[in-house]
Amino acid sequence: MTLMTRTLALLTLLLALSLAALPAGASGAVTIGLGDQNWNTFNQPRFAALGLKRVRVVTPWNVALSRGDRAWLDDYLRNVRAAGMDPLVSFGAAHPSHCPARPCRLPTTAAFERAFRAFRQRWPWVRTIGVWNEANHRTQPTFRHPERAARYFNVVRKRCRGCRIVAADVIDDKNMARWLTRFRSVARGARIWGLHNYRDSNPRRGQRYGGTKLLLRTVRGKVWLTETGGIVRFVLPDGRTLFPYSERRANVALGRVLRLARQYRGRIARLYVYHWQQDNFGNRFDAGLLDSTGKPRPSYHTLKRWLDTRWFTR
């Protein structure tokens, strides 16, 4: 064996050993997108500077059958398409549902199927679907009905062959694992699971659990963090402040969730940061990368830096 041959053999062996030593989930890169309800986000220079190609929007489950909602989503998707972006459209409760108060309307499977067929007919180019947003949360009619949510997924899977489907999009509340166990007993062929992991990204003092590791243990397949980020301020409906205003804390939270996604990037395939800019109407939930004047917050610059690392892609 020549010196060159021995050297090449040694390098090959070292490469193999280094790859074997990597922790599970250390391969691949996590795709980052933005969750936002405002279509005018996509023509802003600061948004263009991030180079993002994925966006998530939440819309009523019967959007294609509701004139006002349909017109709004038409405008939104028109701007998404003009910006060359791929939308993830996630369904949720329809007006005038006010869960957990009344009315709290859970559509029948047949009604959901009629609405989804109309959706496919109007927007056939949308091929990335979230079946139901935060389906295990008490503000959703699916809260106590995971089996019904699973039947919605079965409908979407049947009617959208070849689509990327987020089977169950859950928030990391205490009921998450139990809810998913019931969901999985009815769902057929789920491959992508969505999570809003605010307990991991924004842990509170005394909190004993987050949802990401639990979800990874509970389900098989890929996980998309469909809504996450750093909370600047959050006021509860009863007026109590859960998170007082702090851009610094929000920036730390965003870094925390990006490191978590990096750690589990073999399972976590996508991450949608929520949201772009705080509005001028006093929204109770503020996690914007920009403040209400359009000034970038520290979290904007943190996201921009992480996007340029090898662990993440657009």
Regions found by a protein language model. Name each.
Residues M1-L11:
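Bacterial N-terminal signal peptides that target proteins for export
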Residues A9-A21:
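Bacterial N-terminal signal peptides
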Residues A26-P60:
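Boundary/entry segment of secreted carbohydrate-active catalytic domains
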Residues V30-D36, V55-V57, M85-F91, I129-V131, ...:
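Hydrophobic faces of well-ordered beta-strands that scaffold small-molecule active sites
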Residues T41, L65-W72, S97-R220, T228, ...:
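Active-site cleft segment of glycoside hydrolase catalytic domains centered on the general acid/base Glu
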Residues V55-W61, L73-L106, A110, V131-W132:
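Structural motif corresponding to the early beta-alpha repeats
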Residues R81-M85, C160-R161, V219, Y264:
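Helix C-cap/helix->beta junction micro-motif
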Residues L258-R267, F281, L290-R314:
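Aromatic- and carboxylate-lined catalytic core of secreted/periplasmic carbohydrate-active enzymes
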